[in-house]
Amino acid sequence: MYQFSYVKAKSLKEAGEFLAAHPDAKLLAGGMTLIPTLKARLAQPSHLVDIGGLPELAGIELMDGKLAIGAATRHFEVAGSDTVKKAIPALAYLADLIGDPQVRNLGTIGGSVANNDPAADYPAAVLGLGASVITTQREIAADDYFQGMFATALDPREVIVRIVFPLPKRAAYAKFPHPASGYAMAGVFIAETAQGVRVAVTGAGPGVFRWQEAEAALATNMSAAALDGLAVSAEDLNEDIHATREYRANLVAVMARRAAAKIAEK
Amino acid sequence: MARVEITVNGAKHAREVEDRTLLANFLRDELGLTGTHIGCDTSQCGCCTVQVNGRAVKSCSMLAAQADGADVLTIEAMAKDGVLHPIQQAFTECHGLQCGFCTPGMIMAVAGLLKDNPNPTEEEIYHGLEGNLCRCTGYINIVKAVKRSAELLRGKAR
């Protein structure tokens, strides 16, 4: 690791001001991506501003028929929360599939959504459920928030405060994890929402994306069979040592069928 | 430099450390608690697992500064007065190790797993140990040791 200065922020306001004054400072919450990145010397921030313990970013609650989760909420808290399990069981299920227990004990939902790793799980739920990202400056709809590989609508001084999920009628997530890292080789989140069916795909492309053809097919018939013959184009998908883009395209179709079948059972 | 005060195995330790000091290095180099092993540089192996405020974490992926004020438990605190902790006892009985390098991290991860789920199924044990690697691939006996640990701990609770 290169040298940096560690700063524990006492409030969200203080963290925002610190970021404004130090353009090379980075926020730290759980650190489950950031610290391994620093260990590999892939980043060289001047300061780490620790917001992981801020009470302003804590808490899981149901508000006006929506589920609000504070940005510093750890994955194990979402996975084990009775409120989440009752409101959106697919979200609790997804949180329990992230990384491994040690990662889930420190990693946060805000950190995952801010980082927007193309193989992270939470972006699939945020986009699939049509959630809102509430920041220190504004509210950003999921459809506007995710902008490709590690790219989001956040400006450098903006901090995620909470994620607000509208409750779906039914939802399910199916994931093919990379056997070593636990990251999604392909993960598909399907939700039947008040605005229609939404299908979000993570792990396969350069960033989370909606699969509109599948949404149209599932709108009239929520079943695995409704997806027969449908495929995402392999052309735009990721290819690496772990899988070819054709393999990932097939995984997306298989995971989508599994998620649709899970919803149909509910 | 960061001033940290961390309670480790019940005793408070105040130190002045570089801001980038990892908790694993703090435990090993500052406190001499070398039971916490560092097996990789990539946060994958879980050999460095300790408990921070009651939750299992990889101490190589957390800064000592983040643990300021926290309560940390390492493998050294498991045996008491020369008597093995039930999880250590189970690993011994089931020969849940080959070279033993991953064992401290395994035991601390198992402690975390069994706290959340005192009677895990085999599937749940696999899921609960996903953050720990055994390079000898001695997993069969490790899983046996987890089942035995659960039995011993449940017996103790009764």
Question: What is each stretch, according to the model?
Answer:
Chain A
Residues 1-266:
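C-terminal structural segment of proteins
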